[in-house]
């Protein structure tokens, strides 16, 4: 096992990534105030693709895309288009901080799906404990935070389905997308997701121009969370290995809650804090039971479940 120490620069980049991805829920809340959800989702994938495409081309990361066109297109639907739509519709009735906590349940869905899809990823020992702890957290949130109205409960269900879609995309990236780097795969998926979303977005274009704030929020979300965030994450991945780099994923819901409370004036309840602690700790246990760092863990490693996508 190769141990890699986290430098101050690596910690800084990791915190920046977590802050960007955590901010995606706040930006979503702002964007959907004045944008149809399909339009918002298209702007998010389109801006991400515009940021990543020149870099992927310069690095030769799209080599093999022609051979993997259909798997990458499917990845774009499952990993990007579907969850972005679900998250957009879900956040219409759920506060951004709570949305961040619910979506952070992705590793729990991964552990559950592994029972049927991938025995190598199946939970054992502390992974099962983490799965149980995380499920308790989700049930707590659904019972205390989402039970106020049918709209809120349905919104929470959409957010959990979005997390499930992220988890499915991880398995899809491992089993179907071969011979491409994570950068190439996520860039191709951004392009594919944009193609799929375009006709739906055109059909839901508003009669009037959207406000500057919501439009800027959607574009910033795509450029920073979708584009720059991934590039910085790959940098941390190269310097520290996957086990340490994934710390960013567990900081995301905390940033989402802070942004929601401080910038959007959302309430912070004891149930939300307890749910955050249970879901994040359970997800960490479920996802880290077999993690190892190897010398080959670089941004150019081939696509694996955690390497393309649980985000953001």
PLM feature spans:
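Transmembrane alpha-helical segments that form core, pore/gating elements
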Residues: 52, 110-116, 131-134, 148-204, ...
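Glycine-/small-residue-enriched transmembrane alpha-helix faces in small-molecule transporters
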Residues: 1-42, 89, 148-175, 299-312
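Hydrophobic transmembrane alpha-helices of multi-pass small-molecule transport proteins
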Residues: 52, 73, 105, 113, ...
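C-terminal-most transmembrane helix of multi-pass membrane proteins
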Residues: 2-4, 45-46, 143-144, 198, ...
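Helix-helix packing/entry segments at the starts of transmembrane helices
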Residues: 43, 80, 99-105, 170-195, ...
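Specific transmembrane alpha-helical segments of multi-pass solute transporters/efflux pumps
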Residues: 19-28, 53-103, 113, 140, ...
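Specific alpha-helical transmembrane segments that line the substrate/conduction pathway
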Residues: 39-50, 78-79, 84-122, 126, ...
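Juxtamembrane helix-entry segments on the extracytoplasmic side of multipass membrane proteins
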Residues: 6-11, 33-42, 64-70, 128, ...
């Amino acid at each position: 096992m190769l141990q890699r120490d986290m430098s101050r620069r690596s910690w800084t980049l990791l915190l920046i990534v977590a802050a960007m991805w955590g901010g995606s829920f706040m930006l979503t809340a702002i964007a959907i105030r004045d944008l149809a959800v399909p339009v918002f989702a298209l702007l998010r994938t389109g801006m991400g693709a515009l940021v990543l495409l020149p870099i992927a081309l310069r690095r030769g990361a799209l080599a093999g895309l022609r051979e993997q066109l259909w798997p990458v297109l499917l990845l774009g639907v499952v990993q990007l288009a579907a969850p972005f739509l679900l998250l957009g519709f879900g956040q219409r009735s759920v506060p951004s901080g709570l949305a961040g906590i619910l979506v952070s349940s992705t590793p729990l869905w991964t552990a559950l799906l592994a029972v049927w899809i991938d025995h190598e990823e199946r939970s054992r020992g502390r992974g099962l404990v983490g799965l149980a702890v995380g499920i308790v957290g989700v049930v707590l949130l659904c019972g205390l935070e989402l039970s106020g109205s049918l709209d809120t409960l349905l919104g929470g269900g959409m957010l959990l389905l979005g997390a499930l879609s992220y988890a499915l995309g991880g398995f899809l990236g491992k089993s179907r997308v071969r011979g491409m780097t994570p950068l190439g795969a996520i860039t191709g998926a951004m392009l594919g997701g944009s193609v799929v979303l375009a006709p739906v977005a055109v059909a839901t274009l508003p009669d009037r121009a959207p406000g500057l704030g919501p439009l800027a929020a959607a574009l910033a979300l795509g450029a920073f969370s979708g584009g720059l965030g991934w590039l910085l994450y790959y940098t941390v991945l190269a310097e520290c290995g996957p086990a340490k780099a994934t710390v960013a994923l567990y900081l995301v819901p905390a940033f989402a809650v802070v942004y929601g409370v401080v910038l959007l004036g959302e309430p912070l309840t004891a149930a939300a804090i307890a749910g955050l602690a249970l879901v994040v700790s359970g997800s960490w246990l479920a996802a880290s039971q077999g993690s190892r760092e190897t010398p080959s863990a670089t941004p150019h490693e081939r696509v694996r479940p955690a390497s393309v996508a649980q985000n953001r």
